[in-house]
A protein has these predicted regions:
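Surface-exposed beta-strand/loop patches in extracellular or lumenal glycoproteins
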Residues: 42-59, 138, 147-153, 474-476, ...
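Beta-strand-rich binding/interaction modules
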Residues: 61-67, 442-443, 453-534
Length: 849
């Protein structure tokens, strides 16, 4: 994998030689039953005369290379790059090669549907994987027009960035085939081109955009999955997104059509291929799901649509400005949801519970980096699709918008799009427009917020007189060691008092916080509230420390706060407090168990359940862990039983109970639910919930391999195969663990999604069963990182890292990190992040007294 790297210096040098890439004409022959496919490309480009460079091409074989009419030796190809000597000022390059299909979700992924045996293909090119499908100058600033011609079996359809211009059918050696001819694209980067092929089914619609142009819409999925696709919801969200973005940006949608395709075994949430967006199939709901997942799908739809402007129309010059794509799409998707969809009431509460939690965690790891990151090579960028680039960037943009004003912000974006359409940009291209429209010193703001790392802490310092009125209120700002930056913050202080059993806001102060201490003069003389909530409305990006009185109020009445955003801020503040070892973990467990029953925001409920799970696993003192886990599972069962029938809370609380099951009595309840002897009013044991029960029963030694096989026979679908892999790997025997260790760590035979589920199963259950694999992990992981693809190795490095946080594990990890060679920086980062988690867990355990 490291041998496939491309450095920024190499890209800069190549861009100085390649003056302009005009066009690619790409002919693909895609058989359904082979491991390789034919790829023939003609590239027209201008270059520095007499210079030499290379083109990226990860090939099975290269049949021929022709540069300006001269046949070159195929020895110039090494399977990863093809050398191009003695370039002319104007060049035509023709390469005929064979490329590999993959089962890793990178390049051109091939999937066989177990339900009907049909073959499906889709491409995933970001960051550096269009080179797995056709020879290409794989860097974002060498834009070109792309014309695709694709031959496939006659019953397949092909979807790409542009509409097809014609489809020809004829007999060939392997039966009848169709050749699809697509219009050339506008100038774009190679990573947002796309090919999706197979017997996909589709639903169509259209919209009329702000120019009066009719935009065709399509939603695609596998035949066996199409009955579960909610195309109308996708179309509704898409129309709402189009309306909002075109109005805000004053820039029309830049492409001719907008197709959205659910594709199998997809690694990410979605990919913003221009006019041809791909989504993971988790967003097709064949069973009842938490409302949090429906809202996440909506945010993802809006996120990918925002990319049509941020990233596709205007693209970063190099990957250090990836945030110009991802932070903007992340922020704009929540803004669009809040201002133009049915999720208006909950969108920012969801942002607080999800994105902010992710950002704060990532920003406190040793791998944290500025939003505008230093990206030396592709290995750097592949690990920077993280909580900084996405969630912190979006959080900071929200702060910027509050600071410069939304109208000024959007006006700057219009000029930015007008100036740089179909081109590439750097940070300063945006800052100059923001300064012009707002009159603010945005560069100074950027230096503190975008170009430095770390999260500040804002703490309330409050005093009151004998009458209970505030006599002094200050906000003290601090920073973590090694990140000595104090930043300006726009924030709101909310005054909350108990009114008829609800914590209701009775006053607010909006202010700028800057420097070490900000005195809030406006608060002096006001009645001290039951809860003084710093960062009410969640505008600021900072860890929040409440005063003691407010903490006690929150612990007793968190579920009684009537604002979901305010609850989210309090939940987040208390979670940070326990993570920083300033609240005992068991006290936090009680806080969660006493309040989640009243939480109405689905994502907040999901986040608190996840935080509860992390606390039980890693933060509770070892001597109290089992008892606390048993008590927590019992309480989750009680909450599930009294939750409103058929509600979101009932489903989430029941799933949480299933995952925390430990005692024989708890397993009895799981088994009785599975067998139908026990029911909860309104609860349907549908396909996915049934598999949840199967996996947990397997973990507890109550479900055999033969029983799992029988379940799979009844649900031999992509979902069923994934769950079955998890269940098999969950069986608590040495033989089952050894079998899946071998499949994951040795043979590498599993596809990306099957491997993900298998890792989850392998790690479940009693830690002593897999403790013997701790040392083999360290012995094998560098070899896996060097030999497997990026996505596969990322899953294994993080997923198979020993799970029990102990002092011995911390010591072993430190020794391993010290032994890594310099060229393993990306591997070092991933292991170091795991090490950080162990170190934090040990610190929090010590405070759990």
């Amino acid at each position: 994998m490291p041998g496939l790297n491309l450095t920024r210096n190499e890209a800069t040098e190549r861009a100085s030689i390649i003056k302009r890439v005009h066009s690619y004409r790409i002919e693909l022959d895609l058989p359904k039953d082979k491991d390789v496919f034919s790829s023939k490309v003609e590239i027209c480009f201008d270059a520095q005369e007499g210079a030499s460079t290379f083109i990226d091409a990860i090939t099975s074989s290269v049949k021929s290379i022709n540069l300006n009419g001269e046949e070159l030796s195929t020895d110039l190809a090494d399977g990863e790059r093809i050398q191009l000597p003695n370039l002319a000022a104007e060049n035509t390059l023709v390469i005929d090669a064979e490329m590999f299909y993959t089962n890793t979700g990178e390049g051109l992924h091939r999937f066989v549907d177990p339900a009907d045996g049909e073959v499906y293909l889709y491409s995933q090119f970001e960051v550096p994987d269009s080179r797995r499908v056709f020879p290409v100058f794989e860097q974002p600033d060498l834009k070109a027009e792309f014309e695709f011609i694709v031959r496939v079996p006659s019953h397949w359809v092909v979807v790409s960035n542009q509409p097809e211009v014609k489809v020809e059918e004829k007999e060939c050696g392997c039966g009848r085939a169709k050749t699809w001819f697509f219009k050339p694209t506008p100038r774009m980067s190679s990573y947002i081109t796309a090919i999706v092929a197979g017997p996909y089914e589709k639903v169509t619609s259209e919209l009329t955009n702000s120019e009066g142009r009719v935009i065709p819409l399509g939603v695609y999925a596998r035949k066996s999955l199409m009955p579960f696709v909610d195309a109308e919801d996708m179309f509704e969200l898409t129309r709402q997104g189009f309306e909002f973005y075109e109005e805000q940006f004053k820039t029309p949608y830049p492409f001719e059509k907008y197709d959205q395709l659910f594709v199998p075994e997809f690694n990410a949430g979605a990919m913003e291929n221009a006019g041809c967006v791909t989504y993971l199939e988790t967003y097709v709901f064949r069973s009842k799901v938490a409302e949090a997942l429906r809202e996440r799908r909506a945010i993802t739809v809006l996120h990918e649509l925002a990319h049509m402007w941020f990233g596709d129309l205007v693209t970063m010059k190099w990957w250090n400005d990836l945030w110009l794509n991802e932070s903007f799409a992340e922020f704009m998707s929540t803004l669009a949801a809040a201002e133009n969809t049915r999720y208006a009431k909950e969108a920012w509460a969801t942002f607080a519970a999800s994105e902010k939690t992710w950002a704060y965690r990532q920003d406190q790891l040793s791998s944290t980096h500025p939003i505008v990151a230093e990206i030396r090579d592709l290995a750097d960028v592949q690990v920077n699709f993280d909580g900084i680039t996405y969630a912190k960037g979006a959080s900071v943009l929200r702060q910027m918008v509050a600071w410069v004003g939304q109208e000024n912000f959007m006006a700057a974006l219009k000029v930015y799009f007008d100036k740089h359409s179909w081109g590439n940009t750097v940070l300063d291209d945006l800052l100059v427009e923001l300064e012009r429209t707002s009159g603010r010193d945005v560069r100074a703001w950027s230096a503190k917020w975008l170009e430095t790392a770390g999260v500040n802490t804002l703490a309330v310092e409050i005093e009151n007189d004998e009458a209970g009125n505030i006599s002094n209120l200050g906000i003290r700002q601090s920073y973590a060691e090694g990140f000595e930056t104090l930043r300006p913050h726009r924030a709101v202080i909310g005054f909350y008092n108990l009114v008829d059993g609800k914590l209701t806001r009775t006053d607010r102060i909006e202010l700028d916080i800057d420097g070490e201490l900000t005195v809030v003069e406006e608060a002096i003389g006001k009645k001290r509230p039951d809860l003084l909530l710093l960062n009410d409305e969640d505008l600021a990006y900072a860890k929040i420390r409440l005063d003691e009185r407010s903490i006690e109020t929150a612990i007793k009445h968190l579920g009684d706060i009537d604002s979901s955003v305010a609850r989210g801020v309090v939940w987040g503040s208390l979670w940070d407090t326990v993570r920083d070892a300033q609240m005992p973990a068991r006290k936090y467990v009680d806080l969660v168990l006493n309040n989640i029953g009243k939480e109405t925001n689905s994502t907040a409920l999901r986040t608190q359940i996840n935080n509860l799970s992390a606390t039980l696993h890693s933060f509770v003192a070892p001597e109290a862990r089992e008892e606390t886990r048993h008590r927590a599972a019992d309480r989750l069962w009680e909450l599930a039983c009294v939750a409103e029938p058929d509600s979101d809370a009932q489903l989430q609380l029941l799933q949480a109970f299933i995952n925390q099951t430990r005692t024989e009595e708890q397993y009895d309840n799981v088994q009785r639910l599975f067998e139908g002897e026990l029911t909860l009013e309104g609860l349907d044991i549908d396909a996915d919930l049934r598999w949840n029960l199967v996996c947990r029963l397997a973990t507890g030694g109550r479900f055999s391999a033969e029983q799992i096989a029988a379940e799979l026979e009844n649900d031999n679908t992509a979902n069923g195969q994934q769950y079955a892999a998890q269940a098999y790997a969950s069986i608590p025997t040495a033989e089952a663990k050894a079998e899946y260790w071998n499949k994951i760590m040795v043979t590498g035979e599993l596809s990306n999604m099957i491997q993900r589920y298998a890792i989850s199963g392998f790690k479940s259950g009693k830690p002593e069963l897999i403790a013997q694999y701790n040392e083999p992990y360290f012995e094998q992981i560098e070899g896996i990182w060097r030999s497997r693809s990026h996505e596969i190795s990322m899953q294994i490095i993080g997923g198979m890292y020993p799970s029990e946080p102990t002092a011995e594990l911390l010591e072993r990890t430190e020794a391993y990190l010290a032994s890594l060679p310099e060229d393993a920086a990306a591997l070092y980062r991933q292991i170091a992040e795991a090490r950080d988690g162990v170190a934090r867990a040990l610190k929090v355990q010590a405070a759990d007294i």
